[in-house]
Amino acid sequence: MRDCVLVRVYGERTELLVDRENEVRNFQLLRAHGCAPRLYCTFQNGLCYEYMQGVALGPEHIREPQLFRLIALEMAKIHTIHTNGNLPKPTLWHKMHRYFTLVKDEINPSLSADVPKVEVLEQELAWLKEHLSQLESPVVFCHNDLLCKNIIYDSTKGHVRFIDYEYAGYNYQAFDIGNHFNEFAGVNEVDYCRYPAREIQLQWLRYYLEAQKGAAATPREVERLYAQVNKFALASHFFWALWALIQNQYSTISFDFLRYAVIRFNQYFKVKPQVLALEMPK
């Protein structure tokens, strides 16, 4: 398999969701920092890149301490990537508003009764922006879509690498981590009982902070990031629920996107009271 290349062809109408020029720039940036495979060429509806040795992980793997430590270290490495220029702005709100507008203008008349009304979604989006913007989570370079199959583990080298940079870009640190924690539940058979328990999260966050700082993390730093991450995990549910509604309308993939959207919205409203009760350490 060492002489293999991968060719990825873009899905139907995915330009509604993904900036393909930005994806290529992200690919090249990550490659320059040793975090991505070689990109050989791009074409109008896809790209060709180096095959990365290893196995794609599943929900049963990413909760193993030896593996989640490697994932935390790799995320910390990516989060330290900087580009020259002005201070970056988070992509979260721009993308979320864009997705919401698509749902509101093009999909709303055909929405299932199981999906919250557009007026409710608009109120929740405004609340998320107001509440989360006050948490002072640093804006860093993020993967933004760290589900299990986007993590490749090479047991011979003892490291993990992340793949698929469609949604990568500058964003809130806590969003990237919270989004990954949500992915412990899986995609095809979603089970939020697998969401990492507090002790697992604290250990994961300790690994991450110590890799980022190059020094021991204080209990306050870990607790602060824990609160930020679980609050931003709410935004992750909302983001991918909107995304799934758009995919349900346009995608030709055999996947029940509407069901997935309903699951993510349901989990959003279920955990919102618990998240609201989390206090930021003084």
Which stretches of residues belong to each language-model region?
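Surface-exposed helix-capping loop/turn segments at secondary-structure junctions
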Residues: 80-89, 135-138, 214-220, 250-252, ...
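ATP-binding pocket architecture of kinase catalytic cores
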Residues: 1-121, 127, 131-138, 156-157
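Active-site activation/catalytic loop segments of kinase-like enzymes and analogous catalytic loops
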Residues: 174-216, 234-252, 267
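Active-site acidic catalytic loop and adjacent metal/ATP-binding pocket
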Residues: 1-7, 125-181, 186-188
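A general structural signal marking secondary-structure boundaries and capping sites
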Residues: 75, 79-86, 107, 132, ...
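All-alpha amphipathic helical-bundle segments outside canonical DNA-binding/catalytic cores
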Residues: 217-233
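Regulatory N- and C-terminal appendages and interdomain linkers associated
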Residues: 247, 251-282
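A broad detector of short, well-ordered amphipathic alpha-helices
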Residues: 21, 239-242, 259
